C-alpha cells in the first residue's frame, strides 16, 4: 500500500486539505496527517478545529511515497 504524509498547520484551508486526504484514502493510500506546529490540535483558516494523526517530527518517513504541503493563510 502506498503511503502519504500531509502536513497541516494553523490556517490550513480545510476544504483543500481534507479533499486531498479523502481522495487519497478512497484510492487506498495510507494517509498520515502530520502537524507542522509541534502540537496535534490545529485551527483551520475558518476556525474549524482539526486534530492531526501525528507530529511531523514523529513520523517515520522511511517508507513514505508522497509528501503534500498544503496551503495555509
Q: What do the predicted segments below correspond to?
A:
Residues 34-53:
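N-terminal beta-loop-helix "entrance" segment that forms/cooperates
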Residues 56-63:
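Short amphipathic alpha-helix with an adjacent loop that forms part of the alpha/beta core around
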Residues 71-72:
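Conserved small/polar residues in nucleotide/adenosyl-binding loops
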Residues 28-32:
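A generic structural motif
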Residues 12-17, 41:
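Short N-terminal binding/cap micro-motifs at the start of the first secondary-structure element
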Residues 1-4:
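Extreme N-terminal starter segment of soluble prokaryotic enzymes
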Amino acid at each position: 500500500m502506498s503511503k502519504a504524509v500531509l502536513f497541516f498547520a494553523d490556517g490550513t484551508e480545510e476544504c483543500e486539505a481534507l479533499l486531498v486526504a479523502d481522495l487519497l484514502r478512497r484510492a487506498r493510500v495510507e494517509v498520515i496527517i502530520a502537524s507542522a506546529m509541534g502540537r496535534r490540535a490545529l485551527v483551520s483558516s475558518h476556525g474549524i478545529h482539526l486534530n492531526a494523526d501525528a507530529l511531523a517530527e514523529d513520523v517515520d518517513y522511511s517508507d513514505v511515497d508522497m509528501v503534500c504541503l498544503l496551503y495555509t493563510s
